[in-house]
Every structure is written in C-alpha cells, then in structure tokens.
Regions:
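Non-catalytic DNA-recognition/assembly elements of restriction-modification systems
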Residues: 13-40, 167, 171
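Sequence-specific dsDNA recognition surfaces
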Residues: 31-43, 58-90
Length: 173
C-alpha cells in the first residue's frame, strides 16, 4: 500500500510513494546516468531494407521500443552497427520537433537484438545504475518534460542536443 506524504511535507519526496522506499530523493543530472550520442544519417538508397532503424516515430509510439516494433530499416556496415547500435536499456531521445512540447521526448529499447538509430535521435547509453523502464516513465513526468523543454531551442523548429540533455537534473529515489 502506498504512503501519503501530503501532511508530512518531507522535502524532495513524492506525495504518494511505496513503503519500500524511504528518505528523500536525490538530484542528479542525466549525464551521471547516460552517455549521449547522435544517430546515423545514411543516404536514401540504403533505407528500406536491412536492420531495424529507430526513428522519431518509434520514440513517440506507445509502449517501449522492441526489435519487432521498429518501423524502418537501413543497410548498415559493421562499423556503423558498432557506433550506432542500441543495447537493451538504451534510452532514445527525439532530437528535433516542430513543437517545443515534443523536443527531447524519450523511449527505451527493451530488446537484445541488433538495431540502429537515426540522425534525428540521440541515444543515451547506460553508464550509471538505473532501471530502464523507470527512467522512461521518469522522463515523461510533467517536471521532467518542463526541464527538457527549457533546454530546447529554435523558432519554427525546436532542437535539443547532447549537451542540453546532459544538464537536465531530476530527482531519483
């Protein structure tokens, strides 16, 4: 059963939490948990066959990203697979959007099979200790979205880069 913190007013603790957790949440930047890298930009003749190719549409889709849910395909070299491949638990961020509200949206790759990600995507590779699915939902909270949108820049088209994502600070249990 969840514990209600509304009356206790403990600092930096969610109003409703599970009894297995105690103490305040700690602030950490995304760079403490993730190493960021921009995606692959292949020429058009390589698109349509080959390996699953994660795009913005896959990030925005409901649920997590799996090998079978990826919509696109691309022919990739072994070197490109090494450089732009995704691993189970990698977080993928939307790098560019026509609306500020969508810039930096995130999803998680939850599969062990080889796939690569595209140039309008930034991969967050795990370097810290976290649960990937928790991280996906944390990044979708109103506070996380507000902090992410603040890092977006642009007039008609909004972008966020690796540096902007690295600086986002969130609370972790």
């Amino acid at each position: 059963m969840a514990i209600d913190n509304k009356d206790k007013k403990v600092l930096n603790v969610p109003p409703l939490r599970f009894p297995e957790f105690s103490g305040e949440w700690e602030e950490h930047t995304l760079s403490e948990y993730l190493e960021f890298k921009n995606g692959l930009n292949p020429d058009a003749k390589r698109i349509g066959q080959g390996l699953p190719f994660i795009s913005v549409m896959d990030i925005l889709a409901e649920g997590v990203i799996t090998y079978n849910s990826i919509r696109g395909k691309v022919e990739a070299t072994d070197k490109e697979i090494d450089c732009f491949g995704v691993k189970n638990g990698d977080l993928l961020f939307q790098r560019s959007s026509e609306t500020l509200e969508d810039v930096g949206r995130a999803n998680v790759y939850m599969d062990s099979r080889t796939a690569v990600y595209g140039g309008f995507v930034i991969r967050g590779r795990k370097i810290g200790n976290y649960v990937p699915l928790f991280f996906k939902y944390l990044l979708a909270t109103p506070l996380a979205r507000k902090k992410t949108c603040r890092m977006g820049a642009g007039a008609q088209h909004f972008n966020i880069g690796q540096e902007g994502l690295s600086k986002i600070s969130l609370s972790f249990p």
